[in-house]
Regions:
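Helix-to-loop junction immediately C-terminal to a conserved catalytic motif
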Residues: 72
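ABC ATPase "signature
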Residues: 231-232
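Conserved ABC ATPase "signature" region
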Residues: 118, 122, 129-144
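Catalytic Walker B motif of ABC-type/P-loop ATPase nucleotide-binding domains
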Residues: 173-177
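Conserved ABC transporter NBD signature motif
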Residues: 80-96
Length: 275
């Protein structure tokens, strides 16, 4: 729920990455969520240093959304622990440091664009009009402030949801399929903005099932059937799988049933932190 500056020149990658020894911004320890006999999230471990973009990559139904809901404290875990900025989740007090763009449009259809944005921003004490207008400029809705959300196209509603998720300048940002329904040109602007946020120290966790966006992430977590199959930078994952194609790499890890294996990968660091 949120805001930031309008797009600047394209950024190819986050600037200087913080060291892997930085205190994790997001942690999961043996995190599990069951729905009856189904293990939607099955023993996930991760420790994500700040200032990077992490991609949760997997097919629909792989557990990405459930994992995000556990990390944000919006769902209760069957077992295990989740922490954001060192605080055990769920934590009402910690929500002000978190931005969350849901997979479905988390806005009120009867309210206007401006009313939606100011409502969500006010929940976190953000009332600066100039800042909020910059949010709408970023998503190209600044000329539609009075339009009821119900009259927006699906892509416009997604853009409004993003503006609401970023309006309070959160330190940790969870984006669940943020570019679905967004035109290609605006999608590039979004990713440029994500990289600027990470360069300024924010931590972004972005879920997607679209492989062609994966190379824009600093690190990936391949997820299937509630398990983290592998973690690492896109080039590292391709090299380990012996392919130039990330989709092929994902399928090979899924077929082999591999677990996160590279030294220093997010999931591995979580296990180290518990020893």
């Amino acid at each position: 729920m949120a805001n930031y500056a309008a797009p600047a020149p394209a950024v190819q990658a986050a600037a200087t990455l913080p060291p892997a020894t930085a205190a994790p911004a997001v942690e999961a320890v043996a995190l599990r969520k069951d729905f009856g006999p189904i293990h939607a999230v099955d023993g996930v471990n991760m420790a994500l240093p700040p200032g990077r973009i992490y991609g949760l990559l997997g097919p629909n139904g792989s557990g990405k959304t459930t994992l995000i809901r556990l990390l944000t404290g919006l769902a209760s875990a069957t077992s295990g622990r989740a922490r954001v900025m060192g605080v055990e989740m769920p934590s009402r007090e910690n929500l002000a440091r978190i931005g969350y763009m849901t997979q479905s449009d988390g806005i009120y259809p009867e309210l206007s664009v401006w009313e939606n944005l100011t409502f969500f921003a006010a929940l976190y004490g953000q009332t600066n009009r100039a800042d909020l207008l910059k949010s709408l400029e970023l998503v190209e809705l600044d000329t539609r402030t009075g339009t009821p959300a119900m009259q927006l196209s699906g892509g416009m509603r997604r853009r409004l949801s993003m503006a609401c998720a970023l309006a309070h300048h959160p330190a940790v940002i969870f984006l669940d399929e943020p570019t679905v329904g967004v035109d290609p040109a605006l999608r590039v602007q979004f990713w440029d903005h994500f990289h600027r946020l990470a360069a300024d120290g924010a931590t972004l966790v972005v879920s997607s099932h679209v492989m062609d966006e994966a190379d824009r992430c600093d690190e990936l977590l391949f997820i299937r059937d509630g398990h983290v199959l592998a973690t690492g930078a896109p080039d590292q994952l391709r090299a380990r799988a012996g392919t130039d194609n990330l989709e092929t790499a994902f399928l090979r890890f899924a077929t082999e049933g591999a677990t996160a294996g590279s030294e220093g990968a997010p999931a591995e660091r979580a296990r180290e932190s518990e020893r």
